[in-house]
């Protein structure tokens, strides 16, 4: 068939409305886009250069005042330049600077520049990964990246996956597919066995999926926070004896607080012996796949499903999650058909419609930023960055040991360090001082630290995901903790 393509080309027209605010093929919208991007880039670069602290210190009430004074929908628009100045500037000035070396509160990483460049392409092209005709090249990018990831995880040729909004969605999808595999009674009589230190999204996902309130069984952990294999074996036998259905065993490769990696090989053996779906939540520890420490994830290759989050250890902008399946055929329960989207009779022969592997319909082309990062930095570069963060973490733990006012909870597993402030006025008072110290350091823009509870006591937690969080930075933070905590002790009565 001969089609006159030229007849369908839109001739250039003079804009008489606001259409130049919508990126299109015309020269005016391209000019507007370029100017806006350059202004935004300059603002980010200028603010990064000016960021001497990781937070402005403005109170919640102060920020509320800034935003409450803004009319979000004026009758007449201000234009992009003014909007960027009015909104973009305070958004940058009062952001938490995740790239600051003293930002150590959460699994919230600084971002790789290649990924930021990819974000511009992703947003500007606005591809949607539900059907091939909405994302021709982006679909193939995701397929190629997933093939690379399944190889890194040492899964068989039958494996595949899909990109998700993050670990919670990946975990929920895995539990849903495991439940479907077990039949119609799975959610009524089924159980999910996981570590006592597993991410809360496992319990949350089970509740959303309609499992019974007591369906998630927390297996005891050893002193290092790893799931106890004997305890898991005993629970599997007990569940079978009660006539309940073991839907899945969920192992964790990198718990949120301790960074513990469950014994994956032994858990895989138990799951296989009982024909139970094994899911590995490697949202945190999965970054080791890109480093010389891949062997620490031995047993991952036996999983039915794997959660990965690249906005944790792999320096990706939020969000960037992945679910890998050992057998792509297990995605079948998600393969709904719609005549307008992915009809039974394929319009584009052999072209995949990735909606058939996802809980989402409309979905961003997030695989592009991973591909851009891997290509630009390479295997050796990613290994160096990850290893540097691990080295910094071990140095931080050693630094904690040298201070008599701090007590290290234990050696780090990945990139978290837990420790307590020690007070002569007792552990309860130390708990209160720890919480106040955390807030004081953040409000002063000195450091972003987390607190968590371990063995019933409040601990400081450092999460080192930035290669620039060097021992010198950590020493200054630990000194600031001591100075601030002692000052707070002198000004506060016993709780």
Curated annotation (Swiss-Prot):
Gene3D superfamilies: 3.90.1150.170, Aspartate Aminotransferase, domain 1, Type I PLP-dependent aspartate aminotransferase-like (Major domain). It comes from the Bacteria. Pathway: Siderophore biosynthesis; rhizobactin biosynthesis. GO terms for molecular function: diaminobutyrate decarboxylase activity; pyridoxal phosphate binding. One of its GO terms (cellular component) is cytoplasm. Belongs to the group II decarboxylase family. This is L-2,4-diaminobutyrate decarboxylase. It comes from Rhizobium meliloti (strain 1021) (Ensifer meliloti). The lineage of its organism: Bacteria, Pseudomonadati, Pseudomonadota, Alphaproteobacteria, Hyphomicrobiales. The gene is rhbB.
